[in-house]
Amino acid sequence: IASGGRELAEKIITDEQEHLKDYLAEHAALVAECENERTIPGRVRPRLINMSNCRNVWVHGLTLKNGASWNQHMIYSDNITTDHCRFVSEGVWNGDGWDPDSSTNCTLFACEFATGDDAVAIKSGKNPEGNKIGRPSAHIYVFDCRSTAGHGICLGSEMSGGIEDVQIWDCDLTNSWSGIEIKATPKRGGYVRGVSVRDCTASRLLVHAVPYNDDG
């Protein structure tokens, strides 16, 4: 399954900047708080595969390539299994591979990643979307995966609803930029607890606050 990648993302952002030009000018202070002037227009980029309120889904043996944003996104979903897949999105801004978001019982194994951002990003909503709805991501299992390019396995930064019971093992993140990372903005809220990492190789381990992606 392939999409237009960076070319499609650039076209969508350019069109949305024109569509929102009056709004962006009126809300210049909000734009200044974002990662860059393309952040808000970039929100409309589609996921390659999006699952909303889904149950009991198995994704097996696919190559997911060059989504304009995240490649597989599961939100408010339960019991999602993904295995023996390849995620390819080098050069795509925010080109995450596999993103469970306010979802439970999600399992990922035997997959390869060469992504433009996080290989895996475990999320639970951003700001009010997360802390008012209050649905954590929980019981997330990732094993026997390899990242050859991209940022590695991440918890956050959209995690206002909380993240708990994450188990990661037998993963090779040697060639990833971040290795294993826990990140949030200083005012985001939420929590991370019950994370286990074992028998992995990683370029580094990061636990930190980040200054971007704070709008919402």
Pin down the residues of each PLM region:
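Extracellular/periplasmic carbohydrate-active domains that bind, remodel
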Residues: 1-216
